[in-house]
C-alpha cells in the first residue's frame, strides 16, 4: 500500500464538530433564491439564480445542515487509525479537485452494510464495512471516496434534493437544520438512497479514476476493487455488497465502462 500524505495534528476529524450555527437560514440562503419552484426545475442551478458564488454558498449551507442532521441520527465510528486514514485521503484528493471552493470532508458510520453518501457542498459519509472491503488499500479507498466526490462536483445529489417538493415545503416553514431533520425523518432518506441514473454512476466512476490518477495514485485501483468484489460475489453466488452496490450498475458493467473511457 502506498503511504498516504501526512495529516497535520489537530485536523483528524473536522466533521466530528457539530454544525451549531449558520450565517443565514436556508429559507434566506436557498429558499428565497429558488422562489419555491423546485418541483418544476430542470436543473438545480436554474433555481438558485444570483451569482455562482451565492449559489455555491447556498449549496454548502444546505449540505452542512443535512450533514449535521444526519450525523445526529447515524451511529458513527469513534476516531481511530482507519477514520484518520479516510480523512487523509479526502484531503489528498481534494487538493486535486479542480473546484477548489468545495470543503470536502468525511465521517465514517458504524452501519452494518457497505454504504456511502454524498451531500451537496462537500460532506461525505462512508460506512465501516465499505472501507473494510478495500482492505486498507489507499487507492481503492480513494476510488470509493472519489466516486462520492464526483456526485458532489457533478451536482448529482444537489439536483435530486433541490427538486424534491417535500423539502422545499419544509424549508418554507423551518430554518435549515430543523427542515433538514424533518425531511430526513420523512422522505429524505429515501430520496438520498434512491439509485442515480446509470449515466450518473458511470460518470462518477470515470471521474473517480481520473481524480486518483491526477493525485498520483494508481488509476487502475478502482477497476481492481470492482474486480475483487465481482469475484467475491461470484464465489458466494450472490451479492456480498448489500444495497449499496445493488443501486449501481452491475460490477461487470462498471468495469467495462472504466476500460472504455480510459485514456489510451
Where are these regions (language model features)?
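A Zn2+-metalloprotease active-site environment signal
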Residues: 2, 10-264
